[in-house]
Design a protein with these regions (language model features):
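Glycine-/small-residue-enriched capping loops at alpha/beta junctions
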Residues: 1-106
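Phosphate/ribose-phosphate-bearing ligand recognition and processing surfaces
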Residues: 80-158
Length: 158
């Protein structure tokens, strides 16, 4: 199935699911996370995340998308960059893979990802991009799913 890179605001992408770069407590973050919460409806999304409670690093959980065009939000818990010596690459690939697996479980035909960990988490964009491309490409070769990698602005392009 297709793997497409697009430049857009992820909150406006008409995919079955979008992915939120989350922290372990599933609390609203800054940047992309804040934009997703605001567009979905902060009160509803906060309540849904509080009901789940937490998620492990490199994993993802699902909530409704509320006010977004998507059906679901997959909250992927992403690693912060600590020099690459603490398993960050494996954790980041795991976050992508876990969200992709949720898409399959929820019978999604499409899912949209931001470039996870590349903003406030400080992951080098080129490395984050390579992990995203490798993980998504491997997955779509074996699964019937359209995946969008949504890059918000030219500065996000590695």
């Amino acid at each position: 199935m297709p793997f497409l890179m697009i430049r857009n605001d992820i909150t406006k992408v008409a995919a079955d699911a979008i992915v939120n770069p989350a922290n372990r407590n599933l609390l609203q973050g800054s940047g992309t996370s804040r934009a997703i919460y605001q567009a979905a409806g902060e009160q509803e999304l906060t309540a849904a995340c509080e009901a789940i409670g937490h998620c492990d690093l490199g994993r993802a959980v699902c909530t409704p998308a509320f006010g977004l065009p998507a059906k679901y939000i997959f909250h992927a818990v992403c690693p912060a960059w600590h020099g690459g010596f603490f398993g960050e690459a494996k954790q980041l690939a795991g976050a992508y893979h876990s969200a992709l697996e949720l898409a399959a479980e929820d019978h999604c035909e499409s899912v949209a990802f931001p470039l996870l960990s590349s903003g406030n988490y400080g992951y080098p964009k080129e490395q984050a991009f390579r992990i995203a491309v490798d993980t998504i490409t491997q997955y779509v070769m074996e699964h019937d799913l359209t995946v969008y990698l949504v890059l918000y602005d030219r500065a996000r392009w590695p």
